[in-house]
């Protein structure tokens, strides 16, 4: 058994406390290096068998043993980890930590290798593989023999995650130092991959599960709990008799496959089928048992805190608790969480840069659960029942309440024409698409295409407008794309004078999908000799970029035009055009066009203004030639195309993302809104591709909230002051650099108190570091953020005061408080203001000393100040019970005493 003097021994006997971490690493190394699948399987099975054998010897006479293979499994499949919080560490941060902890010269060869791990060096083919590069840097500096056990590694990783959550960087470094000083270079290579959550084993998690136990994958699908899988299925000879959906246990939802419009009748077995609108919200499952509710996202993350655990809290549960039929004790419902606008009586779409995941009580929009399936009713499990029967049961579960809980409307059909009519109607309504479902289908967790199909306009050739864009920039790839350009920055041309060629190009989007590795390689060869490093300090004058900058650029005359297909054009300040494309994909290289024949700004504006930016501008008509035709209102004819599913949309299915890297391994995000070319769902898909996890509402494990465009929900999240709210630009930079980019003030929309305190010590309010050198380009960027606002918002004043420790100033003693003064005869009727009372003076004092005084008693108020008249206090307390955040009711003495002493007095002694 390996020893580690710096760590406390485990109080309980476990296999993990006896197994050297080196044994696990050597097994992983053998699995990765061998080529054949049987060999890989054998190495893992041998390790697993030895673990189980030792387990039997260790616990032979014990009962109710909870020790299992979980400590090893969570390291082998780190992307499925749910218990441990985010590490907050990716490649670049690891590189900086290694440079610091190993005392490497910052400009030295090894430090440069670590920091620029994605840049090809011409030596080994390790470009983009940080763990391999780190291995060769660490090899001469690391101990020859490791001293850690599997259990100790997990304890140190727990410490890193916990200290990252507590924003304690010092303790994070301390734990990392213990890992470094007690691990060999080989062990650290695998530690890095575990932290980044991309082991690159060349074997799928499905294979790992199947070797562990025949029922493992199925149990994980209905529980999303790796520890439960390892504990319940420790004995490979014991089978689960009933692996099924359980109340209050998150399951992976059933998914839809892409439909072939031409074959839809055959795919539905030439029988009657259902057509539903495909909702553009967040997939959510609701579990209810009496007054207890739980909500889970499609990835098994818990959003109960946001939507409500009981009838008295959350943005949804209080409004729907009473709509359930009296005989319903418990149930599990599957559906889509949407944002509903009661004024227009419409649902918000993701393209509107709105995200339901973080919405709380809101004056403009409200949470609405659109239910399309029921999986349990009064302890009766229904997954094995047909969809038609489940629909009948669903109709008797609750009474729909407009804007709060709906049953998704369906209609029966049996012909292709009815499907096409429904799709055309969805196009006209600017909806995402339609669903087609087999009435006889049963519910199969995590299965795709088992009777459920989806059709979106972008899946059908001929229905979307394509854009001919010029490649002007590139980004180095990582992993299998290491050493080549894997993503491209595309641009449109400034409209030239007649018969002139364009000279200036504006960036519009970054694209990284739609092509095979061979196509990417061929394109790379074509452009290879023309790439030049992009210098942020001295960018090319003919390529204008927004905040999204390429790593390399190419002169327009040496580049090629690519045909891009996308869902829609959306606003974005990341690109020079102030807009970008949602779900862009390269269809083909336009070999028939010269570089100067790309789309112009005028053409872009025409597309952008039409159909609210949607690029699905045509109706689908099936005639004898099966060709799509233009809508009648269109006047410019297009070339007719054969109808079918575009090939590039078959592989990258956004609703079933395949992991391509471990950049965000163990990092939990809450994406509220998208930006530019990246919609909310695209950002979530990219996060999933990078190994991260996405929740619909933030919780204690959420690393940060990603925001592209601010809205009412974002403001409510900021008002809660619990989470770090970060611009989507930061996420895009992470994607661009293939690592977790350290936060800078420019990325932050709102900071939690801990983060704000950290930033106040290192940056000024415009993002200029107190200690790091600043170049001209960075300084210009800082200056661009200095706004000449005549009136500074109170929250910004409060942030500045806190950041620079000005909050001890006597003029800001009430800063950060939103206060309602009780000088209105009727609550929430400003026209009934009572004049000539002392409270009018108190209100002036509150404003003078930094408070925000409001005329309405609503969500967000922190204090209510009462004078001599207490007649309205009872009504205020009744209102307070309905609020998510409770306000304090204090006497006016709290104001006068605080002003007198120059500090905010504790409200306790002034409460009413």
Curated annotation (Swiss-Prot):
Keyword Magnesium: yes
Binding residues annotated for ATP, in chain numbering: 276-279, 283, 336, 350, 372, 432, 437, 454, 456
Residues the entry annotates as binding Mg(2+) 1: 336
Catalytic activity: ATP + (deoxyribonucleotide)n-3'-hydroxyl + 5'-phospho-(deoxyribonucleotide)m = (deoxyribonucleotide)n+m + AMP + diphosphate
Known cofactor(s): Mg(2+)
Domain of life: Eukaryota
PROSITE patterns: BRCT, DNA_LIGASE_A1, DNA_LIGASE_A2, DNA_LIGASE_A3
Main location class: nucleus
Subcellular location: Nucleus
Gene Ontology cellular-component terms listed: DNA ligase IV complex; DNA-dependent protein kinase-DNA ligase 4 complex; nonhomologous end joining complex; nucleoplasm
GO molecular-function terms, A-Z: ATP binding; DNA binding; DNA ligase (ATP) activity; metal ion binding
NCBIfam families hit by this protein: dnl1
Protein function: DNA ligase involved in DNA non-homologous end joining (NHEJ); required for double-strand break (DSB) repair and V(D)J recombination. Catalyzes the NHEJ ligation step of the broken DNA during DSB repair by resealing the DNA breaks after the gap filling is completed. Joins single-strand breaks in a double-stranded polydeoxynucleotide in an ATP-dependent reaction. LIG4 is mechanistically flexible: it can ligate nicks as well as compatible DNA overhangs alone, while in the presence of XRCC4, it can ligate ends with 2-nucleotides (nt) microhomology and 1-nt gaps.
Protein name: DNA ligase 4
């Amino acid at each position: 058994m390996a020893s580690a003097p710096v760590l406390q021994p485990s109080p309980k006997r476990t296999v993990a406390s006896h197994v050297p971490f080196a044994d696990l690493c050597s097994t992983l190394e053998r699995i990765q290096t061998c080529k054949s699948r049987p060999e890989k399987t054998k190495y893992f099975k041998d390790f697993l068998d030895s673990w189980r054998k030792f387990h039997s010897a260790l616990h032979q006479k014990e009962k109710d043993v909870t020790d299992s293979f979980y400590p090893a499994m969570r390291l082998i499949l780190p992307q499925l980890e749910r218990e441990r919080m985010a590490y907050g560490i990716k490649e670049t941060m690891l590189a900086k930590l290694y440079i610091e902890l190993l005392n490497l010269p910052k400009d030295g060869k090894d430090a440069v290798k670590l920091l620029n791990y994605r840049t090809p060096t011409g030596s080994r083919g390790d470009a983009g593989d940080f763990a391999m590069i780190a291995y060769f840097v660490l090899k001469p500096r690391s101990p020859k023999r490791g001293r850690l056990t599997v259990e100790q590694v997990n304890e140190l990783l727990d410490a890193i995650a916990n200290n990252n959550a507590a924003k304690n960087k010092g303790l994070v470094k301390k734990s990392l130092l213990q890992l470094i000083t007690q691990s060999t270079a080989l062990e650290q290579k695998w530690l890095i991959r575990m932290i980044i959550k991309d082991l690159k084993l060349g074997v799928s998690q499905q294979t790992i599960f199947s070797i562990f136990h025949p029922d493992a994958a199925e149990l994980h699908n209905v529980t999303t709990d790796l520890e439960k899988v390892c504990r319940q299925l420790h004995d490979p000879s014991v089978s689960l008799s009933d692996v099924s959906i359980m109340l209050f246990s998150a399951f992976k939802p059933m998914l839809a496959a892409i439909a072939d419009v031409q074959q839809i009748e055959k795919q539905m077995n030439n029988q009657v089928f259902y057509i539903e609108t495909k909702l553009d919200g967040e997939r959510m499952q609701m579990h209810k048992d009496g007054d207890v509710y739980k909500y889970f996202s499609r990835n098994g993350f818990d959003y109960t805190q946001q939507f409500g655990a009981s009838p008295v809290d959350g943005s949804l549960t209080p409004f729907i608790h009473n709509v359930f039929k009296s005989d319903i004790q418990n149930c599990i419902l599957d559906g889509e969480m949407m944002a509903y606008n009661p004024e227009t009586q419409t649902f918000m779409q993701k393209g509107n840069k709105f995200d339901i995941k973080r919405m709380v009580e809101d004056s403009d929009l409200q949470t609405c659960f659109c239910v399309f399936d029921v999986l349990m009713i009064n302890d009766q499990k229904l997954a094995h029942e047909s969809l038609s029967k489940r629909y009948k049961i669903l109709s008797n579960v609750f009474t729909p309440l407009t804007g709060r809980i709906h049953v998704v409307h369906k209609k029966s059909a049996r012909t292709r024409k009815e499907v096409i009519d429904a799709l055309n109607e969805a196009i006209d309504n600017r909806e995402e698409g339609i669903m087609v479902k087999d009435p006889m289908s049963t519910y199969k967790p995590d299965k795709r295409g088992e009777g459920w199909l989806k059709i979106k306009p972008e899946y059908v050739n001929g229905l979307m407008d394509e854009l001919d864009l010029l490649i002007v920039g590139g980004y180095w790839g990582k992993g299998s794309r290491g050493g080549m350009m894997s993503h491209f920055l595309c641009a449109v041309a400034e409209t030239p004078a007649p018969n002139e060629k364009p000279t200036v190009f504006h960036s519009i989007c970054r694209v990284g999908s739609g092509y095979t590795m061979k196509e990417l390689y061929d394109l790379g060869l074509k452009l290879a000799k023309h790439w030049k490093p992009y210098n942020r300090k001295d960018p090319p004058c003919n390529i204008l970029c927004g905040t999204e900058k390429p790593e390399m650029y190419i002169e327009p005359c040496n580049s090629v035009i690519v045909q891009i297909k996308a869902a829609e054009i959306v606003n974005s300040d990341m690109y020079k055009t102030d807009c970008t494309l949602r779900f862009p994909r390269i269809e083909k290289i336009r070999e028939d066009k010269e570089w100067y024949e790309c789309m112009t700004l005028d053409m872009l504006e025409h597309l952008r203004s039409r159909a609210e930016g949607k690029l699905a501008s045509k109706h689908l008509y099936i005639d004898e030639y099966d060709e799509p035709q233009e809508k009648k209102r269109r006047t410019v004819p297009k070339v007719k195309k054969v109808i079918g599913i575009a090939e590039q949309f078959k592989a990258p299915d956004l609703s079933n993302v395949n992991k391509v890297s471990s950049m965000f391994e163990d990092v939990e995000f809450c994406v509220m809104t998208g930006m530019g070319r990246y919609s909310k769902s695209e950002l979530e898909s990219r996060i999933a591709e990078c190994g991260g996890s996405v929740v619909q509402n933030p919780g204690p494990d959420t690393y940060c909230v990603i925001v592209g465009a601010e809205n009412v929900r974002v403001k409510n999240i900021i008002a809660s002051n619990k989470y770090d709210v970060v611009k989507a630009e930061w996420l895009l930079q992470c994607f661009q650099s293939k690592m977790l980019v350290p936060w800078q003030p420019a990325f932050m929309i709102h900071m939690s108190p801990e983060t704000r305190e950290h930033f106040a010590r290192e940056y000024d309010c415009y993002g200029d570091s107190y200690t790091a050198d600043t170049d001209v380009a960075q300084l210009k960027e800082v200056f661009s953020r200095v706004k000449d606002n005549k009136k500074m918002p109170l929250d910004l004043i409060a942030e500045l005061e806190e950041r620079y420790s000005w909050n001890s100033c006597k003029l800001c003693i009430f800063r950060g408080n939103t206060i309602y003064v009780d000088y209105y005869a009727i609550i929430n009727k400003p026209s009934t203001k009572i004049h000539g009372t002392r409270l009018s003076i108190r209100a002036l004092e509150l404003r003078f000393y930094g408070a925000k005084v409001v005329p309405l008693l609503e969500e967000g108020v922190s204090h209510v100040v009462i004078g001599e008249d207490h007649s309205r206090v009872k009504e205020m307390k009744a209102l307070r019970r309905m609020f998510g955040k409770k306000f304090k009711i204090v006497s006016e003495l709290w104001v006068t005493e605080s002003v007198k002493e120059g500090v905010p007095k504790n409200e306790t002694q002034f409460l009413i």
